[in-house]
């Protein structure tokens, strides 16, 4: 069985826990949600680690999720198709290493 990881769609300027619904990539319809560190969050869904098939359905799912996030948040940084993290903890560590408060 393949190890589960987190498929990353985008980064937003928000600390709010947010669930976007069962929209995840790969036909699995996993919940799309935020993983946060201070006032930054990555929008992710669970997915087996590894490659995601490059096909119309997956590309459109990736794009539609980013568009849905953009309807609610002003500061959205899309992430390249096919980007994974091993876990929510890895995402928090990555955000923490890159975090720079506005007051700095």
Residue ranges and their predicted role:
Residues 1-100, 104:
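An interfacial alpha-helical scaffold signature
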């Amino acid at each position: 069985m393949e190890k589960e990881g987190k498929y990353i769609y985008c980064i937003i300027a928000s600390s709010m826990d947010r669930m976007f619904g069962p929209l995840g990539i790969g036909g699995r319809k996993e919940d799309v949600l935020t993983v946060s560190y201070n006032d930054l969050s990555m929008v992710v869904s669970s997915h087996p680690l590894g490659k995601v098939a490059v096909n119309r359905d997956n590309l459109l799912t990736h794009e539609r999720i980013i568009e849905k996030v953009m309807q609610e948040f002003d500061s959205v940084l899309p992430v390249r198709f096919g980007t994974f993290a091993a876990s929510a903890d890895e995402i928090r560590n990555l955000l923490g290493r890159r975090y720079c408060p506005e007051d700095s």
